Amino acid sequence: MLNFDCLTLKAFFDENIDFFIGARLQKIQQPTRRDFVFSMRNNGESRKLYINIYPQMYHTCFMAVVNEEKRSLKTPKHPPMFCMLLRKYLEGCRISDARVIENERILELHFETMDELSQERSLCLCIELMGKHSNVILYDRTTSIIIGCAHNVGSEKSRYRELQGGLKYIYPPTAPSIPHESLISNEHNKSCLLYTSPS
């Protein structure tokens, strides 16, 4: 499959931003440890957001019916613990905001919900598509405390960034990079040079 880089994620996001904002998360499924299906509805339209965090196949997309059949995704009789946690906090909630982190393969979906004491709570579902470090993380936006994640990361795996419930969420370390707009502009300029006839 094509390399799912930050530009691909940004293009996918820009194309679907109008659907994301205000969409209600109706159903959450986790067929395997690394496959997720989020059934959403907005403006009378239903879609299924597919998230794959396999190290060699990480990507996200809205599934067409034919593609859903080809993937042969079967919901287990007993859902994983993380799936049940996501259902507890997010099923029935609407996406209040969404964004892609600049120059990263990270998609964030924000939710405004209510806790057990009927207090407003702002949550973030963070989808990190970064090869062997790919993960899905749910955290509280007010405190940045992680509620749960698809894969816990302990100190033995990462000295810089541990990921598990109860710890503070921090973004992965970033390397110096060029903004999306500059990359796109540079590619356009290269194309112009290649196809400009000599005078």
Tell me what each language-model feature is.
Residues 1-184:
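Acidic, proline/glycine-enriched N-terminal capping motif
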Residues 183-194:
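Conserved phosphate/oxyanion-binding catalytic-loop motifs
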